[in-house]
Regions:
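Phosphate/oxyanion-binding active-site loops and adjacent basic polyanion-contact surfaces
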Residues: 34-38, 66-74, 209-213
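Conserved beta-strand elements of the Class I
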Residues: 29-31
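C-terminal accessory helical subdomains adjacent to catalytic cores in phosphodiester-
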Residues: 2-7, 13-27, 43-64, 78-92, ...
Length: 235
């Protein structure tokens, strides 16, 4: 009897969740390589969008920290879509090259292209960074093209954050979104990232060093921010 009760409760929860999802016109499922840096950054977008009376009832943003690298990130995304019977939405895989093989870094993009041919209602996107998401953060302060080790990016951020009077850069900063928005320049970061990708046209993600496509997800989410916050991201 208890098992039956639990099953009915689970079915009720699934039904309520499905009803909740159907009300959301725009759905974003963000799968992050790490469990701290990337999720905390995108939680900033989520907070402001959910406070925006124009879009909060129309936009769904779910953020998962995968604690996994490259191909395992998209693998976990596929598993989530399958297990939760997701029928519509944008699936974003946010991952770093770090020291992983080029075949794995490029493989996420290739796998996304294959999956996108199967179902036009569920589209996968690769928001990669070479070498790491700190490169995207760094572009908020300067145009940078030197292919240095990722430790140099963190050193750069340390110096900038100390100049701003907020101490050292930490990977688990709760206010990383606000820090970059107020202390840096998101509009410039987007422009710089696009320029780097354009200059690397015809190259694979692993060959564009340094480089990042995180800006694509940023531009997508920025559409739903409150108007006064959008001004930090749009021309």
């Amino acid at each position: 009897m208890a098992k039956r009760g639990r099953k009915e409760k689970d079915n009720w929860k699934k039904k309520r969740r499905q009803e909740y999802l159907e009300k959301k016109e725009f759905r974003y499922y963000i799968f992050c390589e790490g469990q701290a840096t990337e999720p905390k950054y995108f939680q900033g977008f989520k907070r402001y969008i959910e406070d925006n009376p124009i879009y909060r009832d129309m936009v769904l943003i779910e953020i998962e920290g995968c604690q996994a690298e490259t191909m395992r990130v998209i693998g976990k995304a596929e598993e989530y879509v399958r297990e939760n019977k997701i029928t519509k939405g944008q699936i974003w895989c946010v991952y770093d090259k770090d020291s992983f093989p080029s075949s794995d870094v490029n493989g996420v993009v290739q796998r996304a292209e294959v999956l996108n041919q199967k179902n036009p209602d569920i589209q996968y996107h690769a928001a990669w960074s070479n070498e790491c998401i700190e490169f995207w953060f760094m572009l908020h302060f300067a145009y940078y093209t030197a292919n240095n080790h990722r430790s140099e990016y963190k050193k750069f951020l340390n110096e900038k954050f100390q100049e701003l009077g907020i101490g050292k850069y930490e990977k688990n900063m709760d206010d990383i979104f606000e820090t970059l928005m107020n202390g840096g320049n998101p509009k410039l970061a987007i422009r710089y990232a696009k320029r780097i990708i354009k200059n690397g046209e015809g190259k694979t993600p692993a060959e564009i060093a340094p480089g990042t496509k995180v800006y694509e997800l940023v531009e997508e989410l920025a559409k739903y921010l409150p108007e006064e916050i959008q001004t930090y991201f749009k021309k």
